[in-house]
Amino acid sequence: DEGRIVAFCEKPQTDEELDALELPSAPGDDPDARYLASMGIYIFEPSVLTSLLVSVPEDDFGKHIIPRAIESLNVFAHTFDGYWEDIGTIGAFYRSNITLASTQPSFEFHKPEAPIFTRQRNLAATRMLGCRVDRGIVAEGCVIDDAQIEQSVVGVRSIIGASARLYQSIVMGADYYESPADRERHAALHVPPVGIGPGSVIHRAIVDKNARIGTDVVIRNEAGVMEADGEGYYIREGIVVIPKDGVIPGGMRI
């Protein structure tokens, strides 16, 4: 009842470990919630933390520091009933972001009593010409020309060409705007510009920052491949990932 932690297991794997950690009653508002999960946020008295770091030879908080603290000190949990997700895998990261662009997102950025502020960038507002956006989140500084965006997240400085289509995808954007001279130089090397090329179709994918997707590219994973490594891309948990600074030439199909 006091919220004191008397046992802790980092990433329990077996039924026996889970059974040992089940609480006799729900700690929050959900009657079916019978476990406490660590969010990885810890508050220490400075002197206590110093003593632990000196006395424990290992340095992993979850595996070593916290278990030692529980053995010898009073450790208490602050129960949090709000939105929290572990996004340590490609699939979890993808699902969490795509859910934000749904009609009923799990987390709301725009609550008047608790708005979320991002880092100030002083970028111009996004410009969209002849676009159709349905359930989309579009960050600042983008230029989107006659594109169709459905349940997708579009990051800062994204350049999306004419007639491109995004479905259930995450486009991380870019760290910079490409100058005309740089675009010409890359074109001479048959390298597409930063952004999503005209006529490209992207479905259930994550496009990392500064990626170059050429004209008429199709990223769809129609075969439903779960795990694969390709040239300029990889697939994890069925999600196609274009890595940072990746290049997908025009006409390529994934």
Regions found by a protein language model. Name each.
Residues D1-Y42, V56:
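Conserved core of the sugar-phosphate nucleotidyltransferase
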Residues P24-D32, S47-I254:
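Left-handed beta-helix
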